[in-house]
Design a protein with these regions (language model features):
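Alpha-helical transmembrane segments of multipass membrane proteins
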Residues: 29-37, 65-66, 86, 90, ...
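Alpha-helical transmembrane segments of integral membrane proteins
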Residues: 20-29, 58, 62, 77-82, ...
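Membrane-embedded alpha-helical hairpins and interfacial helices in multi-pass inner-membrane proteins
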Residues: 51, 122-177
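Helix-loop junctions at the membrane-solvent interface of multi-pass transporters
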Residues: 39, 92-93, 115-119, 123, ...
């Protein structure tokens, strides 16, 4: 597994892979987003009071670390490292280890990596960021289902849930990044 990760990040030739400075900048971005993610729970919970899944329109903030890091350092692995480190940092700031947060972070980072890989890590265009935000939103639904967050949501309500989170992934995660 470690050999696969080393190859993914550039093999033994570090000039092709990630430099230490790039990893450190990525982790710094992740730390900032770990704090933002924890503070954002307040806005999410306030929006939840409105009902009909309006809070999903704020959800895109949790997708931003990967996109911001990639826009600054467009290299393979950056989005995954940023999102994982932000998720891990979020659990540290929360004061408890939270497996679902780590699972979401890894899958969201991978969703962004897939989009960036499709464009061969060469494009920082608005469309690529939009696709990354949307992919990140879409990958979160199976995890929601697995953890039972969608079990009691009626069909029409689930549709709102999906539409609002997808909009948030596109608008908040992309445009604010």
């Amino acid at each position: 597994f470690l050999r696969m990760v080393v190859r993914f990040l550039g093999g033994n030739n570090m000039s092709k892979g990630l430099k230490l400075s790039e990893i450190l900048v990525t982790v710094l971005i992740a730390v900032v987003f770990a704090i933002i993610y924890n503070l954002w729970w307040f806005a999410y919970n306030v929006a939840q009071v409105a009902g009909v899944h309006i809070e999903q329109l704020t959800y895109g903030v949790w997708f931003m670390a990967a996109i911001v890091a990639y826009l600054i350092i467009p290299k393979p692995g950056i989005a995954l490292i940023a999102e994982f480190a932000a998720g891990a940092g979020e659990t540290i700031v929360m004061g408890k280890f939270d497996i679902p947060t780590i699972v979401y972070a890894i899958l969201q980072g991978l969703a962004c990596e897939i989009i960036f890989a499709i464009f061969k890590y060469k494009s920082r265009s608005l469309m690529v960021a939009i696709l990354a935000g949307l992919a990140t939103a879409l990958i979160s639904f199976p995890v929601d289902y697995y953890y039972g967050y969608l079990a009691e949501v009626a069909g029409w309500n689930l549709l709102l849930f999906i539409i609002f989170r997808s909009i948030s992934g596109i608008v908040i995660a992309c445009l604010l990044s």
